[in-house]
Amino acid sequence: MNEEQRLGRNGNTDAVSTKEAGSATKDYSKYFDFSNAKVVSEEDGKKVIKIAGREISIFDQPDYKQGKRRGKEEVKVLRPDDLIPEDMKTIGAGKKFLVRTYGCQMNIHDSENMAGMLKEMGFEATDETTDADVILINTCAIRENAENKVFGEIGNLKQLKREKPELVIGVCGCMSQEEGVVNRIMQKHQHIDMIFGTHNIHRLPHLLRNALFGKEMIIEVWSKEGDIVENMPRAREGKTQAWVNIMYGCDKFCTYCIVPYTRGKERSRRPEDIIQEVRDLARQGYKEITLLGQNVNAYGKDLADLDYGLGDLMDEIRKIDIPRVRFTTSHPRDFDDHLIEVLAKGGNLVEHIHLPVQHGNSEILKLMARKYTREQYVELAQKIKRAIPNASFTTDLIVGFPNETDEQFEDTLSLVREIEFDSAFTYIYSPREGTPAAKMKDNVPMEVKRERLARLNALVNDISAQKNLEYQDKVVEVLVEGESKKDPNILAGRTRTNRLVNFKGPKSVIGDIVYVKVTEAKTWSLNGEMVEMAEVNG
């Protein structure tokens, strides 16, 4: 999943901290020393240890070696009707919860599931930490900066825990799948009550019960992915846009990426379950869905009984009465001709392709284990543009990969000029503990990396501004998402090509699709005037 979805949909990142962007500065080795821990008991698959006065019940801990293994075990589809134990169905009556989400849309999707379970247990949502009885921090491990923010929040909650000792604080998500992170929390953040990972979200009611009725810190992090759990409660944010997960995990193992370790192997949902979910959302009046996966283009490859891929799925979904359908994130290796053919049919399949390239030099791409060359990417991009000539084409780019030369960086600049991306999300490489790239020696000074990022951003911004000028004085279809973050008197929404549009209009059109005439084209957004409502609102 790309950095655009992880960190927000607008803009690139000019400011990068030295700690975040430099060579690996994190040293978690000290957190692997448990000489000060006392083993209290070991039985029935549970180990209880005591550190600095607090007992910790360990059911499962993260293990990178286990997380990397890709076995041939059958992945079952579970449809439980008893996710919430009987004694937990009213445990939250009169209490409130807060789920803080960092990272990508997949994390937002997971947080919606957790919120759904908490609501079924009687809890009420709140945005205020001081009002919450349960706080869950759903974490992102893709960059060091994201981890630093999480540990900052964990530290800030320590005083609140002192004031409200009955408060339950849980840490979940991708960071929980990292060995060093869990060890650090055990030793340095003992006000945390439970830690669980990405594979056992459905176990939240049981883990919460242990945390509420026991005094120990609860740790249950499955290193190996589990089965696919359907029918999970979900509390979606809003009634306009919805995330629909179509698959889990990633098997690409790019050398810089932690996701295959934290999200497990690729597992596809059954197409009938996905289609039914989309139909339900259409009946509820949703205007846009985004099909989610770490690598959506690999969808269906693990379904042994079906010859069915992403193109087949989208060909069925395009017939459902929902105005807009998006998908993210793609990998160039799996973007096949059938998918291009289906996308070219248009209709509710929007004209926006986000296809992360990461670098413009074939040697660097090989070091990244992307398994394609620059030439192959260009050929694919041109094929897509020929089939969908009005499509917006965006990407992700990394600068400062270990030992990147000036010539190799120039190849990235020339690729941006050749493809003319409508926008790109650009980053200085951030080493991830446990990945092959983190072990590579790097002789590129940080000031050089920063200068390269600035040059790349200047080029991307220039092309983006030119592309946006093409919208000047044109009328575009906009899905109104809400008030502008900068001005509550201005509404904001997106075109089918994913351009941000700001305009004045009545609050009553939030959630609807309207037509807007573009009056000003800026680098990263468009300004306009509302013309009329669109017929697709029904």
From Swiss-Prot:
Annotated binding of [4Fe-4S] cluster 1, by residue: 104, 140, 174
Residues in Radical SAM core domain copies: 236-466
Ranges of residues in domain MTTase N-terminal: 95-213
Purpose of the protein: Catalyzes the methylthiolation of N6-(dimethylallyl)adenosine (i(6)A), leading to the formation of 2-methylthio-N6-(dimethylallyl)adenosine (ms(2)i(6)A) at position 37 in tRNAs that read codons beginning with uridine.
One of the record's GO molecular function terms: N6-isopentenyladenosine methylthiotransferase activity
Record organism: Halalkalibacterium halodurans (strain ATCC BAA-125 / DSM 18197 / FERM 7344 / JCM 9153 / C-125) (Bacillus halodurans)
Cofactor binding description: Binds 2 [4Fe-4S] clusters. One cluster is coordinated with 3 cysteines and an exchangeable S-adenosyl-L-methionine.
Full protein name: tRNA-2-methylthio-N(6)-dimethylallyladenosine synthase
Assembly and oligomerization: Monomer.
Gene giving rise to this polypeptide: miaB
Keywords, sorted A to Z: 4Fe-4S, Cytoplasm, Iron, Iron-sulfur, Metal-binding, S-adenosyl-L-methionine, Transferase, tRNA processing
